[in-house]
């Protein structure tokens, strides 16, 4: 796996492109399941073109202790996805304390993309308004 990813990174790196590896929680049979495993693979590839996609929803399901695990793998994280657990909806609809996570990302100086990979907990306009309210709430840590 590492050798194949190195070959891919060799193609991407001269162009400043980055591939991201995403550990998932949908099945225990999946190859990538933890942030530590993905971190070690990225370290083995040893290229700025091979990084971690840290999906907060999947990592909460697989390992919890989100801030600690983000810190352990920080230097390899290139992209972060958002989704609450359970339900994979907007922040504030599940158990994840997104206000603390957003505060931590801010304090770490994270300037990357935060992908909203989740559904809405309510349908239609009501759901869109709930989504906006949720993001305002979790972004209000200052």
Where are these regions (language model features)?
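An active-site-proximal structural segment forming one wall of the substrate-binding cleft
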Residues: 1-15
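Histidine-acidic metal/acid-base catalytic patches
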Residues: 6, 32-54, 58-142
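Basic- and aromatic-lined ligand-binding clefts that recognize polyanionic substrates
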Residues: 12-45
């Amino acid at each position: 796996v590492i050798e194949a990813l190195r070959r891919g990174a060799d193609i991407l790196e001269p162009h400043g492109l980055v591939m991201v590896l995403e550990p998932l929680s949908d099945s225990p049979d999946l190859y990538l399941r933890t942030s530590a495993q993905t971190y070690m693979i990225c370290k083995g590839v040893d290229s700025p073109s091979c990084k971690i996609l840290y999906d907060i929803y999947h990592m909460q399901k697989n390992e919890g202790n989100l801030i600690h695990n983000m810190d352990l793998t920080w230097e390899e994280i290139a992209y972060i996805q958002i989704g609450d657990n359970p339900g994979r909806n907007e922040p504030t609809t599940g158990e994840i304390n997104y206000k603390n996570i957003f505060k931590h990302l801010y304090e770490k100086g994270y300037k990357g993309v935060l992908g909203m990979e989740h559904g809405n907990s309510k349908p239609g306009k009501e759901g869109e308004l709930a989504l906006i309210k949720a993001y305002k709430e979790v972004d209000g840590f200052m």
